[in-house]
Swiss-Prot record:
<keyword id="KW-0833">Ubl conjugation pathway</keyword>
<keyword id="KW-0175">Coiled coil</keyword>
<feature type="region of interest" description="Disordered">
    <location>
        <begin position="1"/>
        <end position="27"/>
    </location>
</feature>
<feature type="coiled-coil region">
    <location>
        <begin position="23"/>
        <end position="61"/>
    </location>
</feature>
<comment type="subunit">
    <text>Interacts with SPK1B/ASK2.</text>
</comment>
<protein>
    <recommendedName>
        <fullName>Protein SKIP34</fullName>
    </recommendedName>
</protein>
Amino acid sequence: MCYGHNQSLSSRSSLRRRSHDGEDDSVVDDLRDRLAETEARLRRARAREAELSRRLEHMKRFVSVMEIIETFLERRFQEQKDRIARLFSPVSTK
């Protein structure tokens, strides 16, 4: 009878252990899922960062080209203004 009593205790603790193992497994699975989601978000964030960096570099090049064009146009405008001023200025009669 004592043997049967011990057996029921051991089967109860075995059931509890299995229950805890099942809980542990679900906790581990949940943590793995959360880790996978975090890694996926990190990959997306890195891809977004890379895309934004490419766009920023493109915009910097664009601004640089616009500044070159602006300088060129300002110089041309000043040259034409000077040319017109010379055309309409009275000719000196020395």
